C-alpha cells in the first residue's frame, strides 16, 4: 500500500499498483466572457494545457523506495498494535499520517470497541424510525452466538448415533453402554461449556476460553489446549 504525499500532506492512497499522474492540473478553456473581453480568445478553445506527468503502474514494483519518494510516492507502514480479533471487536478504519521526520507514512488503527456479550434489542426509537420492532433482537450477542455454536456441535456429534436410541425405544437392541455413557458425556460437556461462556466476565475472558495455548510455552511442539476443553472421544 502506498500514499501520494503533496505539500507535506497525504492526497491519495493506493491499495494496489495503478497508473498515476503526478502534479495533475486539468486543462482550461476560454469562456464566452473571455471572448467578449478579447475576440482572440475564442470560446471553447484551449486556454491552459493539462499539466502533470503520467507513470505506468509497474513503477510500484520496479522502482526503489527512494525513486518513488522522489515523485511523492511513499510505502505505508501499518501499525497493528490496536488491531483486535474481529470476532470479538469492532475495529476502526485506518488513519494515515505523513511524518515529516523521519519522512515516512504510517497507518494506524484507533481503539477497537468490544462487541456486546448479550443480545442488543431494538428500542422504541428504532421502531418509530422503521428500523425494527421494539424488543426484538437487533444484533446477536457474543455469548448467545457462542452457546448456539456449542449446542449445534453437540447436536452434530449425537446425530450419527441417534438411530441407536430410536432402535432401542422401538423395542430393538439396547443401546451399548459405551455409547450411552458417551452421549451423556457430550450433553454434560455442552452444558459445562455453556456455563463457562455465561460466566465470562468480559469479551477478553470469553475469547480466552477458545484460545489454544501450548502446554509448555517454551516448546512449540507441545500439545495445545484451551480453557473451554474438548468434546469426549466417540466410542470405537
Predicted segments, located by residue:
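Short capping loops/turns at secondary-structure boundaries
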Residues: 143, 147, 168-175, 179
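Helix-centric, low-specificity signal for extended rod-like, repetitive segments
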Residues: 160, 175-176, 180, 219
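Interaction-interface detector
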Residues: 1-159, 191-236
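Secondary-structure edge/capping motif, primarily at the C-terminal ends of alpha-helices
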Residues: 161-172, 193
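Short, charged, amphipathic alpha-helical segments
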Residues: 176-184, 207-209
Amino acid at each position: 500500500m502506498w500514499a501520494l504525499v503533496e505539500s507535506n500532506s497525504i492526497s491519495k492512497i493506493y491499495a494496489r499498483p495503478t497508473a498515476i499522474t503526478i502534479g495533475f492540473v486539468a486543462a482550461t478553456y476560454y469562456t464566452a466572457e473571455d471572448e467578449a473581453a478579447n475576440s482572440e480568445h475564442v470560446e471553447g478553445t484551449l486556454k491552459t494545457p493539462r499539466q502533470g506527468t503520467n507513470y505506468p503502474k509497474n513503477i510500484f514494483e520496479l522502482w526503489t523506495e527512494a525513486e518513488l519518494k522522489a515523485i511523492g510516492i511513499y510505502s505505508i507502514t501499518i501499525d497493528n498494535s490496536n488491531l483486535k480479533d474481529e470476532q470479538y471487536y469492532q475495529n476502526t478504519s485506518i488513519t494515515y499520517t505523513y511524518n515529516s521526520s523521519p519522512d515516512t507514512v504510517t497507518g494506524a488503527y484507533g481503539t477497537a470497541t468490544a462487541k456486546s456479550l448479550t443480545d442488543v434489542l431494538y428500542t422504541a426509537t428504532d421502531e418509530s424510525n422503521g428500523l425494527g420492532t421494539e424488543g426484538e433482537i437487533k444484533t446477536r450477542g457474543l455469548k448467545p452466538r457462542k452457546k448456539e455454536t456449542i449446542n449445534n456441535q453437540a447436536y452434530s456429534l449425537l446425530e450419527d448415533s441417534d438411530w441407536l436410541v430410536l432402535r432401542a425405544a422401538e423395542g430393538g437392541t439396547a443401546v451399548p453402554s459405551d455409547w450411552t455413557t458417551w452421549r451423556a458425556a457430550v450433553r454434560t460437556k455442552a452444558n459445562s461449556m455453556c456455563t463457562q461462556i455465561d460466566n465470562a466476565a468480559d469479551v477478553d475472558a470469553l475469547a480466552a476460553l477458545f484460545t489454544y495455548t501450548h502446554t509448555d510455552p517454551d516448546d512449540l511442539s507441545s500439545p495445545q489446549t484451551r480453557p473451554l476443553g474438548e468434546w469426549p472421544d466417540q466410542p470405537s
